[in-house]
């Protein structure tokens, strides 16, 4: 998301939440590593994403599940929000009463529901 739209995800999350900790589920890292093997825009964006995760020292969280289920698992473990634009993941998160942060207008993040 940051690469395609030129936003600073850390700054945007701080604007929305104040002081926060970014946790990246291993399910996400595995998915992004696969995407990084592709040629073109997708591969470059994924490679940059992996670089950001490493350089910023974001905390990684081991997940028993893969894909969307791993993201939900991590959010439930820490009572956190999910950052995504994926419609199916947003719907699953809403059903579980998890807060969802998404890209709005191509230049800012917005929260669908307040964290409880």
PLM features: residue spans?
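Acidic catalytic patch
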Residues: 51-70
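Short, surface-exposed amphipathic charged segments that create phosphate/polyanion-binding patches used
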Residues: 37-38, 74-75, 113-116
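Acidic, metal-associated active-site segment
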Residues: 65-81, 87-96
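Active-site-adjacent beta-strand anchor residues
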Residues: 25, 82-83
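Acidic, PIN/NYN-like endoribonuclease modules and their adjacent C-terminal/linker elements
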Residues: 90-116
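Domain-level signal for Mg2+-assisted phosphodiester chemistry and nucleotide/NA-binding surfaces
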Residues: 1-56
């Amino acid at each position: 998301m940051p690469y395609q739209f030129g936003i600073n995800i850390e700054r945007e999350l701080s604007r929305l939440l104040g002081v926060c900790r970014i946790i990246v589920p291993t399910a996400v890292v595995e998915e992004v590593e696969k995407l990084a093997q592709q040629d073109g825009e997708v591969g470059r964006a994924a490679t940059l994403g992996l670089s950001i995760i490493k350089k910023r020292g974001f905390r990684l969280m081991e997940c028993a599940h893969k894909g969307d289920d791993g993201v939900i698992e991590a959010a439930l473990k820490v009572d956190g929000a999910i950052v995504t634009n994926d419609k199916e993941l947003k719907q699953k998160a809403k059903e579980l009463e998890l807060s969802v942060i998404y890209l709005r207008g191509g230049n800012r993040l917005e929260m669908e529901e307040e964290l409880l």
